[in-house]
């Protein structure tokens, strides 16, 4: 795109230069020869040669010698000497190869012709000069016919009658409601294995219900069937149940309305196999939830046999999950 703009710019500059050159050439071609060759220099030169005066009306200085000047030459200072006269006399001596003839001994004052006569004699010449060179430029005459512009013909709008269309009743398309998603109704059958985790309080302590309830809500547990908390597929508490949490003390239920007065020695998290979704992912969520409850309430995570949770125990649970896959 930039190269294309550059090419257009160069073409535009070349076109402008061509138009300017053509305009100057046309003006030069139409200009008369009298303006190209100025005859003023030749006429002034001829006028000076014939009458002895230049354009300012000053003639050549005449030098007249006196008798006393021949016998006794008078010394003239450089300041009193006329530079124009000296220059003229010097040029005359340098140009003439023959000795100058003697002039009358009487002193003759130089006679100057008034400038008015010079201009009077020159005026006819100038008038004839400009009269010959005067160029009459005919002004363009605008005729009445050129001024008159032809009136544009008025176009009368032509309206064609549009054919009347009969109203057509548009029947709305039937709204097709999306079919509700069919919930997974696949029966898992009887559970073949159960993965259990315990979160118990430290020796001599209990888990407070006032602290347990906000922790469960943060972990997206929802109170539901069998009066226990469940973890569903959706964080909003919808979908299939992934795993559940019950009270470790019989009868193993919770009362959400009286959680502030509730306390227990521990809770139990369990997940049946097979389960909905990915079993390994569900187990990972359950294990992280158990550790979070233990950290918030100051408890300890134990396995299904209430033994200390170790890395080897975790690997054993993973093998049990893969065996049921």
Curated annotation (Swiss-Prot):
Gene Ontology CC terms = cell division site; plasma membrane
Known InterPro entries for this protein? Cell_div_ZipA (IPR011919), ZipA_FtsZ-bd_C (IPR007449), ZipA_FtsZ-bd_C_sf (IPR036765)
Name the source's superkingdom: Bacteria
In Pfam terms, one family for this protein is: ZipA_C
GO biological process annotation, one example: division septum assembly
Which residue intervals are topologically Periplasmic? 1-6
Question: Residues on the Cytoplasmic side?
Answer: 28-325
- SUPFAM superfamilies linked: Cell-division protein ZipA, C-terminal domain
What is its subcellular localisation?
Cell inner membrane
Q: Where is this region: Disordered?
A: 165-188
TM helices/strands, residue ranges? 7-27
- Primary location: membrane
Report quaternary structure and partners.
Interacts with FtsZ via their C-terminal domains.
Per its record, how is this protein called by name? Cell division protein ZipA
Instruction: Write the gene name.
Output: zipA
């Amino acid at each position: 795109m930039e190269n294309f703009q550059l090419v257009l710019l160069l073409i535009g500059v070349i076109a402008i230069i061509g138009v300017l050159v053509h305009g100057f050439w046309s003006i030069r071609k139409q200009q008369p020869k009298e303006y190209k060759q100025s005859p003023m220099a030749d006429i002034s030169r001829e006028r000076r040669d014939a009458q002895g005066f230049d354009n300012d009306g000053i003639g050549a200085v005449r030098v007249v010698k006196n008798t006393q000047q021949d016998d006794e030459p008078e010394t003239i200072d450089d300041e009193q000497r006329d530079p124009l006269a000296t220059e003229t006399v010097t040029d005359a001596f340098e140009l003439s190869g023959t000795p100058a003839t003697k002039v009358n001994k009487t002193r003759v004052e130089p006679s100057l012709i008034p400038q008015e006569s010079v201009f009077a004699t020159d005026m006819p010449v100038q008038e004839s000069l400009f009269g010959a060179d005067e160029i009459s430029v005919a002004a363009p005459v605008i005729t009445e016919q050129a001024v008159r512009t032809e009136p544009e013909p008025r176009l009368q709008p032509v309206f064609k009658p549009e054919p009347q269309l009969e109203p057509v009743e548009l029947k709305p398309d039937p709204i097709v409601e999306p079919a509700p998603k069919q919930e997974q109704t696949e029966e898992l059958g009887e559970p073949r294995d159960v993965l259990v985790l315990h979160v118990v309080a430290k020796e001599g302590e209990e888990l407070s219900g006032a602290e347990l309830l906000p922790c469960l809500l943060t972990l997206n547990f929802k109170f539901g069937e069998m009066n226990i908390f469940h973890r569903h597929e959706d964080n909003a508490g919808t979908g299939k149940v992934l795993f559940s949490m019950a009270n470790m003390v019989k009868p193993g239920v919770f009362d959400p309305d009286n959680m502030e007065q509730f306390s227990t020695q521990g809770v139990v998290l369990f997940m049946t196999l097979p389960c909905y979704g990915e079993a390994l992912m569900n187990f990972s969520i359950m294990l992280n939830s158990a550790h979070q409850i233990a950290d918030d309430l100051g408890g300890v995570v134990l396995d299904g046999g209430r033994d200390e949770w170790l890395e080897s125990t975790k690997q054993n649970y993973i093998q049990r999950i893969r065996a049921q896959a």
